[in-house]
């Protein structure tokens, strides 16, 4: 499959107009929507423009990995793909794709786990380059391992999120990696000639200080390390109240969920995250430490019933994609306030400069500081 294509080949064509119309209709929901954040960027458009000829010649089916809100999947359909197999780690991204597909009347795609998205017939993959190198390695290995022997990967992102090391990672799974010129502050990498590789395994680290083993699938936040926000919550875990049902919200690798389960073995502990690799990692971490945890992929606490938790622990993200934004954390505070029982507690760690206390008091209830460093603050909020 050739991936060579220039802007001039497509400018003013009916397909170009149809693609522009599609992209203009896309929204981010249920992701954060603001005037500054939109559902596609120049990297998506560059990737689609470049891949147009390859899509038309790919035999009908294309694989898309890492689509953020549906631009690549729905764009590939506009450009002639008869079916798109999609893998994305984020449940928010999946829901945004489904919402945009319903809005635009497109349905010829299917959602898959990473180890199921490729087929031996897959010849073309459109990949939104992740910033995490271990995640990129896992994705590249899966494509090279499970795709057609002549599979081509066209990968892209904005320049500010790219490094030369990404080229090196791709070269570990593909013999040829070509680098495009920059366009609108975006760049593409095209990988061909897959090597004989195996799937990347999870990583594992023992943290003796807290007597915990961390197991992490590629791409989970902080990997198999103890991030300093989680450490701050562990350091005050002896002050957590008693609980019959507790939730690690935004669980990442599940260290806090494991601590909750070890501290009160009879409790029902839920580890919840929007990320598929986080949920898988939390389950593996719990198993490695001999405890039982219910690992759930969810947007916030949307599947949890009102007033059912005694304790929620939270180390919230402060980015929406690459942009610093408080919107995700504030949504999680609201969810926690809804799911906590009267008298239940939310223990939160946050970057001190973000000053979340007013938002916590609005969403949950009276909030007091438990500990503070120049970088992190731990608070406890009590549901009235």
Would you name each region that the model predicts?
Residues 40-109, 228-314:
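Conserved SAM/SAH cofactor-binding pocket of Class I
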Residues 147-148, 340-342:
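Helix-to-beta-strand junctions that scaffold the AdoMet/dcAdoMet cofactor pocket
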Residues 32, 37-41, 46-54, 182-245:
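SAM-dependent Rossmann-like transferase core, predominantly class I methyltransferases
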Residues 2-4, 9-66, 72:
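Extended, compositionally biased accessory segments flanking or bridging domains
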